[in-house]
Amino acid sequence: MRLCDRDIYQHLQDGKIKIDPTPDYDQISGVTVDIRLGNKFRVFEDHQAPFIDLSGPKAQVQEALDHVMSDEIELEEGKAFFLHPGELALAITHESVTLPDNIVGWLDGRSSLARLGLMVHVTAHRIDPGWSGNIVLEFYNSGKLPLALRPKMKIGALSFEVLSAPAEKPYNARVDAKYKGQAGAVASRISSDDQSK
């Protein structure tokens, strides 16, 4: 069952769902709570590697990722991040989100931004039960013009769904969880995957 605005507000008041900073009441509507853009980004460096072999040896995968990912870029107050056409970048939400083990979150981009060519999440829009941390956004500009993105602008919306029972393996209890407590624009940790499974 997806939570309505009234239930989202109540879950926030009761501390079942934690969002920091706490959203204003007017950020909650229908079945979502608005989230804003944070100030940390990463970009892919052009021509630093001919390719990334995602199924190669872990050390080679990590080495390739280290070559293609920029250091984290932290914007000063009032500055904009420019995402150019055809460019992929990582960013974080301004808000940190903590979910209990019986609620899954769903991140959706804004229609107004999509109509300008901005994809807020390339594929990863599920926020697992037991998650705690900032959410990394995978931005892609499929439009024709560069887009200026500013910290604290409204970037997307989260909805929440109650599971039929608490998850047996919530994110915060998993040994293989790669992004626990992330607070920055964390690059892919695919090299940590167990390739034998």
Curated annotation (Swiss-Prot):
Entries under SUPFAM superfamilies matching the protein: dUTPase-like
Record-listed dCTP binding positions: R110, S111, S112, L113, A114, R115, D128, V136, L137, E138, Y171, Q182
Pathway annotation: Pyrimidine metabolism; dUMP biosynthesis; dUMP from dCTP (dUTP route): step 1/2
Any GO BP annotation: dUTP biosynthetic process
This protein's UniProt keywords: Hydrolase, Nucleotide metabolism, Nucleotide-binding
GO molecular function, one term: dCTP deaminase activity
Catalyzed reactions per annotation: dCTP + H2O + H(+) = dUTP + NH4(+)
Active site positions, chain numbering: E138 (proton donor/acceptor)
Gene3D superfamilies: 2.70.40.10
Top EC class, one word: hydrolase
Enzyme Commission no: 3.5.4.13
CDD domains: trimeric_dUTPase
TM spans (from-to): none
Family the UniProt entry places it in: Belongs to the dCTP deaminase family.
Classification via NCBIfam families: dCTP_deam
Role: Catalyzes the deamination of dCTP to dUTP.
Subunit-structure text: Homotrimer.
Protein name per Swiss-Prot or TrEMBL: dCTP deaminase
Organism expressing this protein natively: Alteromonas mediterranea (strain DSM 17117 / CIP 110805 / LMG 28347 / Deep ecotype)
Name of encoding gene: dcd
